[in-house]
Amino acid sequence: MYYAIFESPIGPILLAGDEEGLKYVNFMKGKKKIEVPDSWVENEEFFREASRQLEAYFAGELKSFDVKLAPEGTEFQKSVWNALKEIPYGETRTYGEIAKNIGNPKASRAVGLANNRNPIAIIVPCHRVIGANGKLTGYASGLDIKEFLLKLEGSC
């Protein structure tokens, strides 16, 4: 597994993946030291395209990503993550709407859990999911980052 650190306007982001694709995009919020398994190898070149696209996203120049993804999760989680990728830039959806979109309308809580476990932040836009009341709700990296991303996209 390779990794690199992308310096974003809201702090460092850990990128990790292998030949199958990108497996992790995680905010390093509040972490003084980056800890990765000993078997991981730092390789900025491997993530050049993902970093370029993230840079363009934060500059407001990119609305959808085109990088190979290989998230690890259950089939249900992957179905939720695929549904998240269908939420257009600048728009939001509720957990209930995502549940309906994946054909399981009573699974909004399970959708919330899968959303929280999304290993590929930003690119799989879990930040675009809001509560049924239209309010910002839980975000693994903190509501301040969620609000920043939604404001960047013009949906908050």
Curated annotation (Swiss-Prot):
SUPFAM superfamilies: Methylated DNA-protein cysteine methyltransferase domain, Methylated DNA-protein cysteine methyltransferase, C-terminal domain
Catalytic activities: a 6-O-methyl-2'-deoxyguanosine in DNA + L-cysteinyl-[protein] = S-methyl-L-cysteinyl-[protein] + a 2'-deoxyguanosine in DNA; a 4-O-methyl-thymidine in DNA + L-cysteinyl-[protein] = a thymidine in DNA + S-methyl-L-cysteinyl-[protein]
Keywords for this protein: Cytoplasm, DNA damage, DNA repair, Methyltransferase, Transferase
Domain of life: Archaea
Major localisation: cytoplasm
GO molecular function: methylated-DNA-[protein]-cysteine S-methyltransferase activity
InterPro entries associated with the record: MethylDNA_cys_MeTrfase_AS, MethylDNA_cys_MeTrfase_DNA-bd, MethylDNA_cys_MeTrfase_DNAb, MethylG_MeTrfase_N, MGMT, MGMT_N_sf, WH-like_DNA-bd_sf
PROSITE patterns with a match to the protein in the record: MGMT (PS00374)
GO biological process, one term: DNA alkylation repair
Purpose: Involved in the cellular defense against the biological effects of O6-methylguanine (O6-MeG) and O4-methylthymine (O4-MeT) in DNA. Repairs the methylated nucleobase in DNA by stoichiometrically transferring the methyl group to a cysteine residue in the enzyme. This is a suicide reaction: the enzyme is irreversibly inactivated.
Family: Belongs to the MGMT family.
Miscellaneous comment: This enzyme catalyzes only one turnover and therefore is not strictly catalytic. According to one definition, an enzyme is a biocatalyst that acts repeatedly and over many reaction cycles.
Protein name: Methylated-DNA--protein-cysteine methyltransferase
Gene source species: Methanosarcina acetivorans (strain ATCC 35395 / DSM 2834 / JCM 12185 / C2A)
Gene designation per UniProt: ogt
